[in-house]
Amino acid sequence: PIERYGFDAAILFSDILTIPDAMGMELDFVEGYGPKFNNPIDDKNDLLCVIETEIETKLDYVGSAVKLIRENLHKNTPLIGFAGSPWTLACYILGGGGSKDDFIQVRKWLYTQPDLLILLLERLTENIINYLTMQIKEGADAIMLFDSWGGLLSYLNFPIYSLHYLKKIITRLNQNFPTIPKIVFVKGGGVWLESIVQTDCSGIGIDWTVDLKSAKKIAGKNCAVQGNLDPAVLLGDRSFVRKEVKKLLDSLTEEER
């Protein structure tokens, strides 16, 4: 499909939960439920066992996949590697997998055991840096951080429990790989766009709740904007999809693009 449709880039298709799986939580996918960990975290002892697990060699298969994809892609087609953000991974880890209650368990830890939550976020940050470093070394031309559940955090808590760690990851990768673009996507994060841009990322991803023109103004000339067509648009017929895409493109002037 990459060659057939001439996409601007290819992205490594992988689950963001490869990191907690490598940390010993034994990821499984249950029909009718979704992702579930066979070794969930219930207390401090469980947490300490998980954060002390070395994961690098357990994720070699992802590096091999990146290398194989890069070798088979056209040289002019960039490959985007990615990882989940520390906060988003913590949501799944402390929730035992998927959630139908907006990850109430991690939010409970946030207010009752913040020190333990921070301990987990710090460890995840280091694991993510190593994971993305491996992808870059194996051929990823850009990387993207997905904070799929950042929007669950309050206005005051997002900078503490998500943004702080996103910035740590971007800063370290900028030091080691200054020419590799780094994109940050926070679902429901429109209110924090200015702060996200200040992580010194190369681009921001925005969802359909954010005005594209406003986002571009916040991003400025040195930060790209990715998004923001509502995926549900694809449920419409072909003419409707074309109309919505054109509307999106026409919302920016040539200079703004």
Language-model segments: residues:
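A gly/proline- and charged-residue-enriched helix-loop-helix capping module
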Residues: G32-N72
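A short acidic, glycine/proline-enriched capping/turn motif at secondary-structure boundaries
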Residues: I16-I19, G34, K44, P86-T88
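N-terminal basic, low-complexity leaders that serve as flexible interaction/assembly modules and, when applicable
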Residues: P1-E31, K168, R242, L249-D250, ...
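Short, flexible active-site-proximal loops enriched in glycine and acidic residues
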Residues: A9, F37-N39, P78
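Short, conserved acidic/polar surface loops in the N-terminal third of protein domains
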Residues: D21-M25, P40, A90-G95
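A charged helix-plus-loop insertion that forms the helical arch/lid used to bind
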Residues: L27-D43, S99-R107
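Active-site loop segments of alpha/beta catalytic cores
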Residues: K58-R257
